């Protein structure tokens, strides 16, 4: 019930603000915090695009995140994550779910905090 109330408030606030701006709604949090699930619900409610950064990376590379880490290493993954995230954040009026560790990246953090509406889920 609490989640429903919070989602309703997010949607009412966001609909008014996001449709008049170039901002995105960005969901942040550690792995398993609900970024993708809640982001998907919010995007459907607002009838705007949903971008899941981890899914975008998997499509781009053709491997799961786990396989990318195993085969290419974390450094490679973080480089792809940065490029994919910053490119996605250039779009406007979308709901974006970041990867669990993406917000530790200075460029991503600065872009999100300076130019978008963000929600930390825990």
What are these regions (language model features)?
Residues 112-122:
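Conserved phosphate-donor/acceptor-positioning beta-strand/loop module used by diverse small-molecule
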Residues 30:
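P-loop (Walker A) phosphate-binding loop of NTP-binding proteins
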Residues 49, 53-113:
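ATP-dependent small-molecule kinase phosphotransfer cores
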Residues 27:
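Hydrophobic anchor at the beta1->P-loop junction of P-loop NTPases
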Residues 36:
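Walker A/P-loop
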Residues 33:
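ATP-binding Walker
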């Amino acid at each position: 019930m609490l989640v429903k109330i919070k989602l309703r408030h997010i949607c009412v606030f966001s609909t008014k603000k996001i449709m008049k701006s170039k901002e995105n709604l960005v969901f942040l949090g550690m792995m398993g915090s609900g970024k993708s699930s809640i982001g998907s619900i919010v995007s459907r409610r607002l009838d705007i695009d949903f971008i899941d950064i981890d899914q975008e990376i998997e499509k781009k590379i053709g491997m799961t995140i786990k396989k990318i880490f195993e085969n290419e290493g974390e450094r490679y993954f973080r480089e792809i994550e940065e490029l994919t995230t910053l490119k996605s954040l250039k779009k406007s009026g979308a709901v974006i779910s970041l990867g669990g560790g993406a917000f530790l990246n200075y460029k991503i953090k600065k872009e999100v905090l300076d130019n978008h509406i963000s929600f930390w889920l825990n």
